[in-house]
């Protein structure tokens, strides 16, 4: 199948209409819906997720609408999160011919931070670097089907040091009634929310952070979700004959079969697999031996309800569907700049994540439509407040001017900032950016209107930096010498 660029544009408009309809049920004001849709579409471009760059990508004259969207505008990110399962099921429909059907993959990922002011940021293990980092950790539940994967639910993990510090919580806007919860407890809450919301899922997969939790596995059983969860090698398992052993001690009596758990980027993911019965007739110990690495093993606890086959093939297939949650993290970080947000308060970081989840589903909808695997409803006529084009389309000669002067510094501390302060001088990075714009404009890649828009943004950024520098210098010069 071959799709045209016109198809891509049409599917983008249809996906916008789908997301806009959802936003309209979450947000009361049309301008908030329009700003949120602009935010989501801007995330889909190659840009950093700070309000300045998102606003420029969306065609706004300044960052104020984006800042208000994450801050003072009245809307509930929790309602937006609750709407994710319905949209996810529409975008990633079930394949009737799939052996295991749709399921959930749980995992956590870190959003690295420099300072200590961001809500829930603290030194903790970050899987992205493999060491302790100052970061915010999130727990995600991804809907996984044969058509793709996307975030269906999320929670921010609040470390114990934050949970016990009332003053710090209040400053970051963390609700007083939000209690500390472990990562498995957050995943349990997500599974319950998703099943209650009517999302059709049949299984769950997770790594050892969740697999070692008996409460997590019990919750999945109560929800009739088959599971394949990783456990550590020293986890004790009671075998069918009644003997309790470490998981790695069961290797001695295991008979391995070479099978594939799915296709990867380099072909089928083969490995040696062995299924060992446990004292629970519906639960088994699954062992994977990495291909060409005889001393590397992964251990799983597997369970299936009575109406599903508790076979090796069934469990291996589920085990292979855990990896797509990592794909959602790569999409969120690499394609949608989720981890580059400069939001700090609790509501702001959760709003940004909710909007990123919608951006991920929007992308999945377009991807499925282009591949011929999904159907998007026809989009209504676009309104003026959701076009995402530059606010001004007229070009004056001054709009193409490049301000190269340097803003003045305050001679005396405490002086007010001049109302018409000049921008700061051109940095090397800004010079390179402007030269690239000029080159694209001369080659006909960039229109004059878009060039003028980008130059206005350049002047705005540097004038804003000049005002900030003025206030910093003025404050320091006014401070008494020590």
For the regions a protein language model found, what residue spans apply to each?
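A short, flexible helix-boundary coil/loop motif
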Residues: 1-31, 43, 158, 172-183, ...
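Conserved, well-structured functional cores that handle cations and Mg-NTP chemistry
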Residues: 2-204, 209-226, 233-236
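Non-catalytic, well-ordered alpha-helical scaffold segments
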Residues: 34-37, 52, 298, 313-316, ...
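Extended, non-catalytic structural segments that build the interaction scaffolds
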Residues: 38-42, 296-322
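Short, surface-exposed beta-edge/turn micro-motifs
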Residues: 100-101, 138, 282-283, 296-299
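Catalytic-loop motifs flanking and including active-site residues across diverse enzymes
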Residues: 137, 324, 328, 350-357
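A glycine-rich, aromatic-flanked flexible loop/lid motif
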Residues: 287-303, 321-336
């Amino acid at each position: 199948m071959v799709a045209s660029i016109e198809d891509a544009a049409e599917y983008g408009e249809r996906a916008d209409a789908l997301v806009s309809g959802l936003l309209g049920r979450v947000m009361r004001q049309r301008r908030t819906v329009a700003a949120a849709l602009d935010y989501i579409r801007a995330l889909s471009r190659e840009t950093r997720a700070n309000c300045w760059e998102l606003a420029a990508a969306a065609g706004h004259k300044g960052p104020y609408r984006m800042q208000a969207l994450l801050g003072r505008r009245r809307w509930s990110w929790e309602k937006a999160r609750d709407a994710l399962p319905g949209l996810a099921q529409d975008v990633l429909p079930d394949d009737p011919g799939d052996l295991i059907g749709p399921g959930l993959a749980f995992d956590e990922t870190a959003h690295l931070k420099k300072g200590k002011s961001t809500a829930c940021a603290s030194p903790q293990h970050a899987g992205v670097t493999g060491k302790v980092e100052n970061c915010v950790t999130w727990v995600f539940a991804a809907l996984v089907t044969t058509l793709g994967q996307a975030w269906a639910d999320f929670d921010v993990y609040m470390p114990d040091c934050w949970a016990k510090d009332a003053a710090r919580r209040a400053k970051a806007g963390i609700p007083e009634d939000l209690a500390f919860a472990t990562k498995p407890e957050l995943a349990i809450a997500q599974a319950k929310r998703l099943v209650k919301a009517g999302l059709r899922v049949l299984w769950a997969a997770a790594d050892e952070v969740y697999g070692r939790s008996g409460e997590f596995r019990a919750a999945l059983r109560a929800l009739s979700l088959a599971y394949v969860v990783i456990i550590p090698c020293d986890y004790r398992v009671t075998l069918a004959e009644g003997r309790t052993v470490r998981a790695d001690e069961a290797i001695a009596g295991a008979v391995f079969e070479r099978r594939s758990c799915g296709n990867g980027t380099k072909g089928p993911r083969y490995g040696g697999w062995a299924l060992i019965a446990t004292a629970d007739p519906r639960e088994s110990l699954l062992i994977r031996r990495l291909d060409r690495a005889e001393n590397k093993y992964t251990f799983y606890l597997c369970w299936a309800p009575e109406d599903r086959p508790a076979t090796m093939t069934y469990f291996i297939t589920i085990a292979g569907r855990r990896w797509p949650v990592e794909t959602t993290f790569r999409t969120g970080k690499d394609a949608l700049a989720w981890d580059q947000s400069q939001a700090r308060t609790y509501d702001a970081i959760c709003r940004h994540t909710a909007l990123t989840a919608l951006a991920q589903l929007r992308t999945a909808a377009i991807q499925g439509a282009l591949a011929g695997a999904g159907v998007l409803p026809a989009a209504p006529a676009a309104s003026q407040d959701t076009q995402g084009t530059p606010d001004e389309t007229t070009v004056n000669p001054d709009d193409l001017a490049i301000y190269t002067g340097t803003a003045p510094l305050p001679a005396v501390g405490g002086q007010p900032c001049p109302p018409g302060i000049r921008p700061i001088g051109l940095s090397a990075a800004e010079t390179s950016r402007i030269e690239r714009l000029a080159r694209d404009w001369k080659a006909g890649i960039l229109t004059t209107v878009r060039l003028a828009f980008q130059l206005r943004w350049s002047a705005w950024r540097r004038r804003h930096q000049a005002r900030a520098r003025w206030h910093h210098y003025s404050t320091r010069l006014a401070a008494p010498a020590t």
